[in-house]
Amino acid sequence: PHRELQALYTMMRVFMAILCSLLAVCSVSARDSRQKGTDGQAAIYRLPPFERAVRCTKYFEGWHSEKHHPYVGWGHQVQPGERYSARTMTKRQADALLRKDLRKFCAMFQQFGKDSLLLATLAYNVGPYRLLGSGKIPKSTLIRKLEAGDRNIYREYIAFCNYKGKRHAMLLKRRKAEFALLYVP
């Protein structure tokens, strides 16, 4: 019985040594991956602002397939006369289309200077007329504030987070990410 007990203690020591080694390796690995995550987050800020807008839009829009008609690629809304198909669109074509749309919206909001890219990114998601107004839709508080020269627009910007009349958590997260990435103080 004494030898069996000694063997059991030895096995437990070996097991504990292996377990401690495994925990040490896991904690070092987790620390390294967290640091890489931080570097990855910092890396996006090293990109030019337009590239940040493209990456952010792709991340939140996701890929649109045939079931998302009339949206294709990274969220482009097919306009009358356009002949895009979600079935045949490549990632490269969708990327080019996203960039073309963002440039078009930047031009639409160029009078707002350094806020034009932020507004273009918002317009890509909600439509330019939700911001600028037209017919039955009044001009947004965000645009009225910018026209008055007030650039303290965080609250007005993140207010664009409703879907079917209700606040949507993912849209709020998207607005906060866009603002953090694209707002120029």
Where are each of the predicted segments found?
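Short, Lys/Arg-enriched N-terminal segments with co-localized hydrophobic residues
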Residues: 1-11
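Intrinsic disorder/low-complexity segments in short proteins, especially the signal peptide
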Residues: 10, 27-28
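Bacterial N-terminal signal peptides
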Residues: 17-24
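Long, amphipathic alpha-helical surface segments
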Residues: 19, 29-64, 76-100, 105-108, ...
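Early exported N-terminus immediately downstream of N-terminal targeting peptides
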Residues: 69-72, 76
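Structural motif
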Residues: 110-115
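Short N-proximal segments of mature Sec-exported proteins
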Residues: 116-130
